[in-house]
């Protein structure tokens, strides 16, 4: 069993499964991993070729649906949910193991209106080919660890927070794709020489910049969205020019990824790692 929903840019949602009164799903194509383009090169008399690189093509989801009941009304409702290609729609898919979504643009919506059983076929092109998990995971890195939770009952004193000289956290990439992440930094005092490390890969990203109380840092390492910005008193400052030498756009390998950070004034900054698992197919 599976659930298929579509959301348009206005936030309207339609479920095409489990609604036999109005719609019947004939088929859904493009749910598994899209084809890859393999780039190779040949050399002299060497048999075969040498691998250079590879990339996944765009995902093409094709939904074939039969409108029931008020056939004309339900067909016209599809026009509203599947917008013209100038605005995106979001496809939600859920099965036993995964609840995911992907954004795309409607390429075609066509059908034969004069068949005894009218069938509508919708083709959606997804420029970014990976399915995204519906759950966003937030992992905190701080020298001060919160220990106070509700509800509680105590008979002897307990710590409500704890200081650690070497903040560390583990992020688990449970998807099947190496992915980026969004790094948030909230500054409450003078902080400089900020370095954020992925101990698993041995890579880091850092900034030669003096941060001050109230600063909000956002570093995006997602493919196609690379950026490093600072929000200070309503003004956005591009931090790209302040990247420390040797900095890399940190990625999440499959499985465990161990993170830590260091800075002068490290007690005055909290780092939050925002991650979403990505999948090649459902």
Task: Put a short name on every predicted segment.
Residues 1-58, 99-110:
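Solvent-exposed edge beta-strands and adjacent loop segments
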Residues 46-69, 116-129, 257:
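Oligomerization/assembly interface segments of phage tail-like spikes and tubes
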Residues 55-89, 97-98:
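Compositionally biased, low-complexity regions
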Residues 62-66, 92, 123-125, 182-186, ...:
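Residue-level recognition of well-ordered beta-strand positions that form the cores
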Residues 90-133:
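Short beta-strand and beta-hairpin "edge-sheet" elements
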Residues 132-140:
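Short, charged, solvent-exposed linker or helix-capping segments at domain edges/interfaces
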Residues 139-282:
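Intrinsically disordered, low-complexity segments enriched in serine, threonine, and glycine
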